[in-house]
C-alpha cells in the first residue's frame, strides 16, 4: 500500500505539471500578447504549438512506454518537460516561445500516457478504480486550477513565472520516481509505427493551420493525411492506434464524448480570460480567481462521482454531466459589460464545474476499464489523451477563428483587419470608442459559448453508445 501511494503521488505530480501548463497560460495570454507584441493568431499558436506536438506524439509516447518501460519513459518526459519550461521562461519573442512550447509538448507526450498505464499495471483490480478516480480528480483539478495559479503568478511575479513553476514540480517528481517507484517491464515487443505517427502529426498540424490561417489547401492536406493514417493503421503489424480497440462500444462512445466535451471546454478556457481581463478589466489574479467555483466543485465532487460510477455504472453520469456542462456554457452568454461577478460569470462557471465533476472521473475509468488486454493500456490511455488534447487543439483554432470573424464583421469599416485580429486588444481609431470594441468582443464571445454549449450537449450522445452496467 505504501508503494502504491508513492506511485500515485509521482503520476499525479507529473501529469498535473503537464495539464496545468495546458491551461495556466490562458490567463497569461492577454499579458503575453501585449509584452511580446503578438496578435491573436500568434496567441493561438502559443497555446496550439504545445497541444499540436502533445496530440501528435502522445500515441508514440504510449507505445514507447509499452516497449521500453513505462516508468523509464515517464521519467524522461518529466525531465524534458522541466528543461523546456525553463526555455519558455527565457523566451523574448513570440516565435521563440512557440518553439519552446512545442518542446514542452514532446515532454508531455512522453509522460502523460505513461501515468495512467503505470497505475493500471501497479494497482490490483479491486483498488484500481479508486486509484484512477483519485488521479482523474487531482489532474482535472490541476487543469482548472491552472488559470487561478497563472493569474496570481502573472500579477505577483511575471508571466515568465507560469513556466518556472514547473521546475520544482519536475524535480520532486523525478526524486520520487528514482527512489520510490519500481521499474515495470516492457509489455509489448516490435517496432513503433513511425509512419502512422508522421501522418497523424501532418493531419493535425495541417488542420490547425487551416483553421487559424484560413487556408483551404491545408485542410485538404489534413484530410488526405488522416485517410492515409487510417489505411496504414489497418495494415501495419504494430499500429500506433490499434483500431481493434474501437470494436468496443464503450471505448468508442467514451472517446466521442471526450472529443466533443473537451473541445467545448478548451474554447471557454481560451476565450474567457480575454473577456475578463481586456473587456471586464479584471486583474490577472482576479481573472484566475474567477475560476475558483470550478476548482471547488471539481475537488469536492470528482471522487464522489467516480465512486458512484463504480456502483451504478458510468452511462447515466456520462449523459447527465455533459448536459449540465452545456447549461454552464449557455449561462456564460448572459454577461454583457460590467456588473457583479456573482450575477454575471459565477452562475455559468459553477454550473460548468458541476457538469464536469459529474463527468470526468467516470469517463477516465470507463476508458481504462473498457480494454480487456492490459498490454494495450498505454495505447488506450494515449488514444484518449490524444483525443482530449486534439479536441483542445482544433477547438482553439476553430473558435479563435470564429471569434475573429464575428468581431471583424461587427467592426467592418471601422477597424482594420490587422487590428481586428487582436480582438479586444484592438486599438480603436479616432472617432470610435473603446465601448464599440468591447461590444463586438462580447458578441463574438456569446456566439462561441452557444457553440460550446451545443458541443457539450452533443457529447452526451457518445455516452448513449456505452453499454449499460449489468
Residue ranges and their predicted role:
Residues 1-179, 304-305, 312, 333:
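Transmembrane-helix bundle of Major Facilitator Superfamily
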Residues 168-186, 203-212, 223-236, 462-467:
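C-terminal membrane-cytosol helix-exit motif in multi-pass small-molecule transporters
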Residues 6-27, 40, 137, 195, ...:
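12-transmembrane solute porter fold
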Residues 55-56, 86, 144, 201, ...:
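Hydrophobic/small/kink-forming positions within alpha-helical transmembrane segments
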Residues 124, 372-373, 416:
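Helix-capping/helix-break motifs at membrane-protein junctions
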Residues 173-207, 245-247, 415-423:
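Central mid-sequence intracellular linker of multi-pass
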Residues 1-3, 431-438, 466-470:
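Intrinsic disorder in cytosolic terminal tails and internal cytosolic loops
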Residues 155-167, 213-216, 283, 404-453:
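A membrane-interface helix-boundary motif in multi-pass transporters
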